Design a protein with these regions (language model features):
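Domain-length cofactor-binding catalytic modules of enzymes
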Residues: 1-156
Length: 156
């Protein structure tokens, strides 16, 4: 299953690159929720942050994602969080986040996906970016934070 997932991501990326005509400068794979057979680690809610390994830590629809390099910290099992983590369940987010709040916080980011059916994916449903950034310094070196220009979420 893990090999299939790797190949599937590569094919999706290849399709997008071919259709857009973009030039690939560099690339890396950053997977989460998997069994690292080589290190004998089950990474649930985590991604590989081995020494020198590039990884992505998604924040939310508004704030983007962290591009980082692993420090290989054994105290963290050479791992890092695979995302910001929820502060609200999908149900709670749909009950507590208004569409007006969601639209307001997403100003400046083009998206046709800021709608009622994606309230559970709003930035309010996730931990604040600053909280994540301040807590991962022992396991990764942050290279950059990429900000979304366009954000798309599938609806139902």
């Amino acid at each position: 299953a893990q090999r299939f997932a790797i190949e599937n991501r590569a094919l999706m990326a290849e399709s997008i690159i071919n259709k857009t005509g973009w030039k690939v400068i560099s690339s890396f794979d950053s997977i989460h929720n998997y069994i690292d057979l080589e290190a004998r680690i089950l990474r649930k809610g985590a991604t590989d942050a081995s020494q020198g390994k590039y990884l992505v830590i998604p924040l939310n629809m508004r704030d983007g994602a962290i591009i980082a390099i692993g420090k290989g910290n054994e105290d963290w099992n050479c791992s890092a969080p695979h995302g910001a983590g929820r502060v609200m369940s999908r149900t709670k987010a749909k009950e507590n986040v208004s569409l007006a709040e969601f639209k307001n916080t997403m100003q400046g980011i083009y998206s046709s996906s800021v709608v009622e059916s994606t309230l559970d994916e709003s930035p309010f449903a996730y931990k604040k970016s600053g909280e994540i950034i301040s807590r991962i310094q022992d396991t990764v070196k942050i290279e950059k934070i990429i900000k979304p220009v366009y954000n798309f979420k599938a609806k139902n």
